Amino acid sequence: MKAIANFKKALKAKKAVKIIAGIDNFDAENVLKVAKAAERGGADAIDIAASEDLIKLVRENTSLAVFVSSTDPEELLMAKNAGADALEIGNFDAYYRKGVRISAEEVLEIAQKTVELVGNDIMICATVPGHIDISKQVKLAQDLEALGVDLIQTEGSATVEAQSAGARGLIEKAIVSVANTVELCKNVEIPVMTASGITCTTAPMAFAAGASAVGVGSCVNKLSSELEMTATVMSIVNAVKAEKTSAELV
């Protein structure tokens, strides 16, 4: 319970960092490497695939809040019973890589079934697909909020390819998700977490747009060594802290 309390505290302070191992990443060695790097780098939560073994492994080896991602309500119920701290409807990148697009109606249906199954005594986060029209994103976010979802995650880079290299390319990838964050923050009361293209360069943009948290995936989980992963997480966490400190001084 302490882990999720710490995440909620960071969420309230608008500086929470969640590291995403991947909805389709069932490689226990890699997931543990990402989770340990997330903790050592100062992140607040780790997001893993729906597997009892992975949940047990991460809980036994870290003190992070454990998010479990799936689009199957039954798997999310299993995750709750296995000790997950939060349930994530998403992340959808694995589906996009297969050419599958998930609709607003599908997300809402999954959320409804999940809430019915798991109740309201565990944090539920839902990803709003970045490829749908922004007006539909807003409507979906409002419907999810009315349903009792606690946290909205945005996305964007799955449908946007960067045209530039370096820092400019990173910004191009993140800009759609950041823009979606601005709109959703204006239209819902629950916190918003920005994901897709988030790095130490783009994380401050997300918080400036109104996000309460960032979800960071490929820039960490695609690295080969735990040392590299830890350093990357640390750079993101430090960028977030620096952004918050600057905002407080203004």
Regions found by a protein language model. Name each.
Residues 2-194, 199-250:
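Alpha/beta enzyme core
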